[in-house]
Every structure is written in structure tokens, then in C-alpha cells.
């Protein structure tokens, strides 16, 4: 029987990256669990205080909750399995599991950009149109907008997964520590022009479009604050630089993950495949609950109060 692509049925893949880091797998496992645990704790605290405190039932805090929950979803699709695989010595993943992980990672990535954009727009309205803000950005509007964006993202990510399903796999070795769409496309026998075009156009459209909106909103916000007072100006610039740092690390990682296969002429170092996703989707994204939650005064105070209650010590 001929072993042509049409006759090859792939049910499992090998995550080569896990084999490459075998010598220090316990260190990586501890790091993965630490990042996931911190993210889970911070996300839980932010969501809990926002849900229970009526004073926080406002668009800005709703958006912060949506962002940290999305970060939690992204980390949950990556770090727990990574830690389990490293501790157990397992380096394989099923086709179904691979597609599910790819779907969750892509959904997290696209929804994160839109959340950044919505938050920038919300702050622009709050500073630039304070008298109309509560009419323009109600809780219902925020929730409806976020839900519509989420559904849109589910659709575009599902289309990407379906485009992969129509292909035939010729290999099983994924040069990474987890599954994502570009890794799978590198293993197919068919022409992937449609897949590459779809992802490239979508990535450029979303990234550039959202980046322009974010830049416009924050620049306008800073300009308005400069006209108010020196204190407001200082706070706005400090907040803006924090947001730019978090967003820049995130967007650079997304672009790298999407273009590394299409732009490279040879195999990419497995160590690079490990370091970039770990920093980009791990440490950088896990910082979001701190950046957007703990640096927000109202949230920070409520979280501290709840922590004092947990340890049974009255706040001084």
C-alpha cells in the first residue's frame, strides 16, 4: 500500500519542544505553574470584587474583568498542559486536543486586541466627553459590544480551524511546546496559500486597525489632559506608557508567531519557539491583571480589603 499523503491518517502529534527542554523540564514546569497560579489568583480577586461591589459596576471595571478573564482563558489553554507534560515526560498531543488548543490560543489573541481597543475608546470617552459618557458608554452597551466582538472572534477563528481541517498532514513533529495554527500548517502536504492569505490579511487588518484606534484614543486623551492640569497630565502619561509597554510586547509576539514560518527560509531554533511564546503569552499577559487591575485605585482598595478579611486581620 502506497504511503502517499492521502493514505496517511494522523491522530497524534509530537511536541518536539518538550523533548528539547528535557534537561530542565522541572524548572520550566515550576515556572509555568507559578505564572498560571498568579494569573488565576489575580483574576479571581478582580472578578470577585467587581461582581460583589456595586460601586464597581461601571464600564471601565467591566472591561477590566473581561480582559483578565480572557488572559485567564489564554493561559489555561497553555500552561496547565505544559506543566503536566513536563512533569510526566509526555510529549504527544492528539489531533483533537491540538485543534482545541489552537482554537483557544487564537481566540485569546484576537479578543485581546479588541479588548485593548475597547478600553482605549472607553477612556477617551470618559476624559473627552465626560458629560455624555454615561449615555454613550452604559453597562448594557459595554456588555453588548463585548459579546458581539466575542462572537465575531469565535467566527473568524473557527474559519481558520476549518481551513486547516481540509488539509492533509504529512508529518507529526511540531517544533514547539504547544499547538497553534501555524505549527500545524507547517506539517501539511497541500497548498496552504489560502490559509496563509487568510491569516495574514486578518492579522494585518485587525492589528493595524486596532492599533490606529488605540493610538488615536490615547493621544487624544493625553492632549485633553494636558489642558486640564499638571497632575492630570502626569497621571495620563504614566498610564499611557504602561499600556503601550503591555500592548507592544503582546502585539510583537502575535506578529512573530504569525509570520515566523512564512518569512523564514530555514528551521527556527526550538529555543526561540519556547522563549517567545513563554514571554509573550505568559509573563507579559499575566502582567495585565496587575497593570489594569492593581493600578486602578478603586479595585486595588477593594482587593486589599478582601485580602485582609481572608487572613482575618483588620485593615489599619
How should each PLM-predicted stretch be described?
Residues 1-316:
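Transmembrane helical core of 7TM receptor-like proteins
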Amino acid at each position: 500500500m502506497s504511503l502517499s499523503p492521502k493514505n496517511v491518517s494522523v491522530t497524534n502529534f509530537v511536541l518536539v519542544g518538550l523533548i528539547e527542554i528535557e534537561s530542565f523540564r522541572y524548572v520550566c514546569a515550576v515556572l509555568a505553574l507559578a505564572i498560571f497560579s498568579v494569573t488565576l489568583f489575580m483574576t479571581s480577586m478582580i472578578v470577585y470584587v467587581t461582581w460583589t461591589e456595586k460601586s464597581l459596576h461601571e464600564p471601565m471595571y467591566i472591561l477590566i474583568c473581561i480582559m483578565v478573564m480572557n488572559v485567564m482563558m489564554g493561559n489555561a489553554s497553555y500552561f496547565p498542559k505544559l506543566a503536566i507534560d513536563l512533569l510526566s515526560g509526555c510529549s504527544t498531543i492528539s489531533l483533537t486536543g491540538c485543534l482545541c488548543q489552537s482554537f483557544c490560543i487564537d481566540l485569546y489573541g484576537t479578543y485581546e486586541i479588541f479588548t485593548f481597543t475597547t478600553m482605549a475608546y472607553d477612556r477617551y470617552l470618559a476624559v473627552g466627553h465626560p458629560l455624555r459618557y454615561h449615555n454613550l458608554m452604559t453597562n448594557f452597551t459595554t456588555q453588548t459590544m463585548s459579546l458581539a466582538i466575542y462572537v465575531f472572534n469565535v467566527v473568524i477563528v473557527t474559519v481558520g480551524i476549518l481551513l486547516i481541517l481540509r488539509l492533509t498532514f504529512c508529518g507529526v513533529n511540531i517544533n514547539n511546546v504547544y499547538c497553534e495554527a501555524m505549527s500545524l500548517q507547517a506539517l501539511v502536504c497541500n497548498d496552504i496559500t489560502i490559509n496563509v492569505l487568510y491569516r495574514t490579511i486578518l492579522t494585518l487588518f485587525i492589528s493595524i486597525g486596532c492599533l490606529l484606534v488605540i493610538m488615536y484614543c490615547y493621544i487624544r486623551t493625553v492632549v485633553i489632559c494636558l489642558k486640564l492640569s499638571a497632575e492630570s497630565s502626569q497621571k495620563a502619561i504614566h498610564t499611557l506608557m504602561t499600556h503601550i509597554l503591555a500592548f507592544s510586547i503582546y502585539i510583537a509576539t502575535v506578529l512573530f508567531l504569525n509570520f515566523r514560518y512564512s518569512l523564514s527560509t530555514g528551521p527556527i531554533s526550538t529555543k526561540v519557539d519556547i522563549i517567545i511564546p513563554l514571554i509573550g503569552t505568559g509573563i507579559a499577559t499575566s502582567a495585565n491583571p496587575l497593570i489594569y487591575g492593581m493600578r486602578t485605585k478603586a479595585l486595588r482598595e477593594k482587593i486589599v480589603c478582601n485580602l485582609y478579611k481572608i487572613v482575618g486581620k483588620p485593615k489599619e
